[in-house]
Amino acid sequence: MAPGAGADRTHHTLTAVADSVAPLPAVCFDFPYRKAGKRAPDKAPVAVAAVRDEAAALVADAHIAARRLVLGGRSFGGRMCSMAVAEGLPAAGLVLLSYPLHPPGKPERLRTEHFGALDLPVLFVSGRKDPFGSPAEFEWEVVAIPGPSTMVWLDGGHDPRNADETIARTVVDWLASLR
């Protein structure tokens, strides 16, 4: 699980999801900028490479096939995971929590150019009032994803309050549907 740009691997939602999927192996990781103590997120090529490296480490440590991994994260982290998969990283599915469809107030700057390469199951979990993408905007954009997409809407914005248990349960149920 990859964190959003303003958070680290200890973000409450990421740890709730990682804890809930046990006994499956789950790893929350930090991007290189966070490890270096910087505040500004890495550029996409660096962040996508970090996703690839973390996926390779989990495959080696857990002795599983890369195509069985489910990758994901929150906001920036989820976007970087989806871009890594679009660029060819094998995965069984994507969990995208509070996906940043566009910057707040700039719906013309969509972050969806890679959606057409996501030929795998994708779970989106977002707040109905998220300034990074409304339910209507998501419905319009996810049709570009060739794989099956599931949208789950929660009350709230980009970081839905008191929703960790609901988000974790949603992810667990969705993972069970992949078997």
Regions found by a protein language model. Give the residues of each.
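Acidic catalytic loop of the alpha/beta-hydrolase fold
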Residues: 128-133, 159-160
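Catalytic histidine-centered segment of alpha/beta-hydrolase-like enzymes
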Residues: 156-166
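Short alpha-helix in the alpha/beta-hydrolase fold that links the catalytic acid
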Residues: 14, 108-111, 120, 134-142
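Active-site nucleophile loop of the alpha/beta-hydrolase fold
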Residues: 31-32, 95-104, 127, 156
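Short beta-strand/loop motif that positions the catalytic acidic residue
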Residues: 118-119, 124-126, 130
